[in-house]
């Protein structure tokens, strides 16, 4: 008897331009649709990070790539063998939602960059997402050239050459390009084979203190639930180190905002892990990899509507400091990513920046700027260790655009 549900051991981001087929690709591999927010259904684009797990299996008697499958039964009727379960993070491809994409990148071990074969390369968001992977240092990348069913052979080859030219000199320059049709299920076995070889499960230290990067938080109680039947708030995110068990005590930082005498400050929140969910199953222990649901004893009003997204949880006393301001070393890009591609001016004192640190996105005001470093005062504090990478966005026209990367000092 095979174990059908296993905890995912690696997080793979799906990135690329809106409507290039990322969500269809997840559905093809996992049978799940990641757009589970009502607003997303209406607009047809992933707004918050969508998650879905897929179990890769193989039929050992078949040749590559035919041996790779997500089915439990091989063509000859025998049972397929479990390779590993992966968690896909479907990052939004919508321009104004770049911050969500960047917060998702903080929990990705590798990425599949989805590029449509029937559109010019690169589209603005494709370029911006690739830049984000570069900034955060994700270099295990596979490129899926999707929608090949909509073009002829010559168009597909021209598009392939455009992709190769586009990724030249970037973190994805050696990434394999796999032609697929997620809609028609073409070459999905080859894509799985390529993911297996290019995006390995990272080595992790099982003895480190648990650290959960919170990317979502929910109140799962239905309206009208009586207080006796209320379920505590739920955190969704990724364990980046250590392990977490039911009944563990955890601290969440920066925590909740407390207002006193017209001043507000953030205070860490402590609670107990009531339940753990991984790979769609309730489990007693979770290890790094995949996306988890952590049921807590928190008042659900604290967690509803992603109120704790961007926070960090772990054993009390083990977390990095909460920072209301910090100094960072800055490396600016040569130009703003996007259609207008204008040059980037140096950061100046007084300007607002949108900063993504781990899964947290906050706005900071620059209090001091020198050549390659600046100090910022944050609107909402973050919990982050020294050396953290920070994506820096500046207001360009009506949008926040990625302009560089900072390293927390």
Swiss-Prot record:
UniProt-listed SUPFAM superfamilies? EF-Tu/eEF-1alpha/eIF2-gamma C-terminal domain, P-loop containing nucleoside triphosphate hydrolases, Translation proteins
Positions with a binding annotation for Mg(2+) 2: 19, 44
- Provide the residue span(s) of the region labelled G5: 181-183
**Which BP terms does GO give this entry?**
formation of translation preinitiation complex
Region of interest: G2: 44-48
What's the stated role of this polypeptide? Answer: eIF-2 functions in the early steps of protein synthesis by forming a ternary complex with GTP and initiator tRNA.
Q: Which NCBIfam families match?
A: eif2g_arch (TIGR03680), PRK04000.1 (NF003077), small_GTP (TIGR00231)
The name under which this protein is listed is Translation initiation factor 2 subunit gamma
**Primary gene name:** eif2g
């Amino acid at each position: 008897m095979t174990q059908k549900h296993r905890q995912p051991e690696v997080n793979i981001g799906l990135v690329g331009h809106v409507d290039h087929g990322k969500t269809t690709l997840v559905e093809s591999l996992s049978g799940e649709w990641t757009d589970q927010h009502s607003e997303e259904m209406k607009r047809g684009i992933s707004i918050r990070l969508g998650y879905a797990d897929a179990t890769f299996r193989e039929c050992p008697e078949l040749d590559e790539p035919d041996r790779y499958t997500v089915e439990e039964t091989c063509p000859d009727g025998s049972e397929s063998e479990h390779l590993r379960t992966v968690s896909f993070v479907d990052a939004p491809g919508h321009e104004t939602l770049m911050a969500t994409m960047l917060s998702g990148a903080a929990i990705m071990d590798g990425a599949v960059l989805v590029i449509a074969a029937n559109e010019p390369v690169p589209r603005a968001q494709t370029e911006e997402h690739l830049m984000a992977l570069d900034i955060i240092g994700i270099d295990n990348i596979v490129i899926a050239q999707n929608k090949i069913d909509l073009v002829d052979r010559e168009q597909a080859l021209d598009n392939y050459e455009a992709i190769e030219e586009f990724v030249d000199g970037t973190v994805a320059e050696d990434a394999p390009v796999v032609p697929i049709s997620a809609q028609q299920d073409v070459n999905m076995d080859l894509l799985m084979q390529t993911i297996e070889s290019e995006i390995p499960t990272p080595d992790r230290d099982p003895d480190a203190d648990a650290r959960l990067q919170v990317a979502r938080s929910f109140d799962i109680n239905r309206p009208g639930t009586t207080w006796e039947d209320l379920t505590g708030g739920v955190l969704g995110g990724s364990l980046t180190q250590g392990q977490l068990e039911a009944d563990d005590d955890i601290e969440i930082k920066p925590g909740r905002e407390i207002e006193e005498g017209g001043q507000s400050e953030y205070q860490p929140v402590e609670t107990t892990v009531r339940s753990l969910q991984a790979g769609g199953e309730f489990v007693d222990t979770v290890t790094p990899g995949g996306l988890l649901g952590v049921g807590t004893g928190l008042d659900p009003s604290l967690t509803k509507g992603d109120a704790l997204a961007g926070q960090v949880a772990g054993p009390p006393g083990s977390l990095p400091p909460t920072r209301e301001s910090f100094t960072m070393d800055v490396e600016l890009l040569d130009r703003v990513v996007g259609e207008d591609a204008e040059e980037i001016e140096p950061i100046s004192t007084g300007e607002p920046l949108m900063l993504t640190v781990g899964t947290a996105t906050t706005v900071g005001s620059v209090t001091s700027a020198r050549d390659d470093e600046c100090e910022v005062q944050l609107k909402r504090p973050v919990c982050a260790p020294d050396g953290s990478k920070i994506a820096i966005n500046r207001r360009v026209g009506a949008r926040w655009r990625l302009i560089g990367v900072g390293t927390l000092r």
